[in-house]
Amino acid sequence: MKLIKPSFQIIEPTGYTIDDIYKSIELAGRCSHKSEDKITEISAKDFVGRMLNMKHLATCEFGTIYLYYKVDKPSTMVKEIIDFYKNNQYSKVECVNSYSDTYLERGMGRVYDIESEYFITTNLRVCLENNRQEYLTDALCEPTEYHYKRYTVKFICDRGILAEFTRHRRFSFMAESTRYCNYSKNKFNNQLTFIIPCWIKDLKEGNYYAYCEYHHAETDPCKEWFAACMNAEHVYTELIEKGWKPQEARTILPNSLKTELIMTGFDSDWQHFFKLRCAPNAHPQAKELADMLKDKFNK
């Protein structure tokens, strides 16, 4: 078995074109089956197409879309577009009004020309489910200082913390699936990987092959944890060898099993996440990751 510490990675988009959006979706979507090795320069569009054919639109939530409209006299169509995103709970709209130096004479008063700029942040699932994709061609843009930003983070944590983090329902989630991942395969080095709890201070990361490799007193409770993880790996492998499917053998896997979790949300969602998960009474393993991520966000 392999023991590692938890970690995270802030995933930056490769760009903001529709092809770049597809790449973000594929990267997140392949986390579930751990099929990232199938990603190529041209695989993203086909991957998204398959997801759409199977109605798996949840993956499209990871395709962040930034739109821009500049209007002086909004048409009925543009007004309808803006109103839709304003009322959509998964989108955010910022309006900036500018006043021109010239003015119009209207009766006895002077009324300055007003131009309104609309900065919209949404995701591809919203566009697809509401038949908005035809409006993307002209309005798609890179994020500006006025756009509400969305951020994507990949956590390497245990299954217990996965359950904690996915309670933040404002986010989009994609997690490594124990139903489909067969950890007895060469792809996973024929072993299970477990997360070292933060309260076990002297256990090093690495591969372990026998119970006796934990050199501590028999009364040390951490030795029991070590033995339980090793036993889980042994039983899991044995069940697979005897014909059980991964979705059946996974029933004996403990919370300490390593998993990968990708989360995408607005900056306000992450601030709420930090408020709860960095609190003194938060679960210590959740706080461990949240504190590290908050420090990175603040830099």
Language-model segments: residues:
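Family-specific signature for flavin-dependent thymidylate synthase
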Residues: M1-K299
